[in-house]
């Protein structure tokens, strides 16, 4: 009877210990590399020269929140895309979103990190075009910078201790981003 009781206690202890292994505990740093789908600036009149690519860093500054399954991360984000406008003889447009990123993580199940993130930064849009109208050449080149932001619901599923597949859905450079995460 004592052995059965000890076995049950050991199994419960191991079960709770396995639950306590967080995917994003305090001090953890992750790096994302993503490919965006469904841009927010360019439409069907543009063709892709460089698809929306993004990199992000996320560092956990607090964990053990919300029944021990939540954590807070801070980091940065950089995303860029380049398109050619089909209506002009030669036209290239680019968009870059860069800024700090904050995230709120909650682990529902083992190996799955779910989170909400907010990016507040700068959106840089550049264009360079050449066209002819009635045999008159028109050229323009400019860059503008304005407040940029992004908000995403994301998830990372860890395939190993270090590597995860990730997906983010929301607003920013694109509506959907898929990619990989490396955990330091």
Q: Language-model features: where?
A:
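Short loop/turn motifs that connect adjacent beta-strands in outer-membrane beta-barrel proteins
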Residues: 21-28, 62-72, 108-113, 159-162
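Gram-negative outer-membrane beta-barrel domains
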Residues: 105-114, 123-128, 136-184
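Outer-membrane beta-barrel translocator domains and adjoining extracellular loop/strand segments
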Residues: 43-48, 85-92, 127-136, 179-182
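Transmembrane beta-strands of outer-membrane beta-barrel proteins
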Residues: 29-33, 70-76, 98, 114-120, ...
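Residues on the lipid-exposed face of transmembrane beta-strands in outer-membrane beta-barrel proteins
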Residues: 35-39, 53-59, 78-80, 100-104, ...
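Short glycine/proline- and aromatic-enriched beta-strand/turn motifs that initiate or cap beta-hairpins
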Residues: 19-65, 172, 176-183
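Residues that define the transmembrane beta-barrel architecture of outer-membrane proteins
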Residues: 27-29, 47-53, 70, 92-98, ...
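Cleavable N-terminal export/targeting peptides
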Residues: 1-27
């Amino acid at each position: 009877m004592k052995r059965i009781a000890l076995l049950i206690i050991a199994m419960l202890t191991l079960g709770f210990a396995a639950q306590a292994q967080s995917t994003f505990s305090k001090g953890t740093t992750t790096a994302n590399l993503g490919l965006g789908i469904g841009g927010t600036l360019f439409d069907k009149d543009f063709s892709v020269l460089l698809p929306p690519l993004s990199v992000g860093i996320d560092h956990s500054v607090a964990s053990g929140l919300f029944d021990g399954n939540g954590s807070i991360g801070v980091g940065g984000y950089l995303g860029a895309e380049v398109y050619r406008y089909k209506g002009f003889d030669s036209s290239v447009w680019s968009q870059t979103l860069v800024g700090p990123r904050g995230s709120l993580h909650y682990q529902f199940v083992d190996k799955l990190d779910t989170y909400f993130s907010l990016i507040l930064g700068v959106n840089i849009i550049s264009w360079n075009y050449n066209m002819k109208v009635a045999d008159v050449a028109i050229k323009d080149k400019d860059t503008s910078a304005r407040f940029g932001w992004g908000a995403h619901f994301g998830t990372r599923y860890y395939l190993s201790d270090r590597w995860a597949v990730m997906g983010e859905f929301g607003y920013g450079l694109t509506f959907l981003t898929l990619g990989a995460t490396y955990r330091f």
